[in-house]
Amino acid sequence: YKAVRTIEKCPVIAVPAKGREHAVSYRIAAGMVDNMEEKEYLDLDTPMTKDRQILNQNYEKAAKRIIEELEKGKDVAYLTLGDPTIYSTYMYIQRIIKEKGYETSIINGIPSFCAAASKLNESLADRADELHVIPSSYDIRNALRYPGTKVLMKSASRLAEVREILKEKNVDVKMIENCGMADEQI
């Protein structure tokens, strides 16, 4: 419960959404942390785009808002889903904050694909098996040639296309959407 204790101690919570009520990470934290209503919030909207210039501008803007709070002597907790080191917007913002000389720390989470494997009662890799984590918002055709288990992440925006590719390649697939949440689908 290191994450819960950290959120309880931090007076400012950064939420990666237009409004915290839209953030799954906020709803999860609010169910675990008693004093969430006492917090100040930074709603840090990051657009879903591959345009590096737009993304970098948003990362800089988010880092600036967090640094403003740090300059006031306040600690800030940034909410993420899963593990912040795997395809998380936080890592881009964290690098900027670190480069500006501020101390940061990361509390590991449970990667969604590990939670999904547990839910399915399946191993991701045994002995010498390879495990490949692939962002399916990019071209997955080449990645499907890799040996071992392939985990396709971030596929929501291209789900129909991903399904077609998997069907075409006759790949054995197991899928969980919103693993561990009320609207989970297997």
Sequence positions of predicted segments:
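Short beta-strand segments
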Residues: 45, 79-81, 134, 152-154, ...
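Class I SAM-dependent methyltransferase SAM-binding "motif I" and its flanking Rossmann-like core
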Residues: 85-146
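Solvent-exposed alpha-helices and their adjacent loops that cap or buttress functional pockets
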Residues: 5-6, 70-71, 78, 123-127, ...
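Short gly/pro/ser/thr-enriched loop/turn and capping motifs at secondary-structure boundaries
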Residues: 20-22, 49, 111-114, 181-183
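Residue-level preference for the first positions of well-ordered beta-strands
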Residues: 73-77, 130, 149-151, 172
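A contiguous loop/helix-start segment that scaffolds small-molecule binding in enzyme catalytic cores
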Residues: 144-186
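Class I S-adenosyl-L-methionine
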Residues: 1-102
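Conserved beta-strand scaffold positions in the cores of enzyme catalytic domains, especially
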Residues: 41-43, 104, 133, 173-175
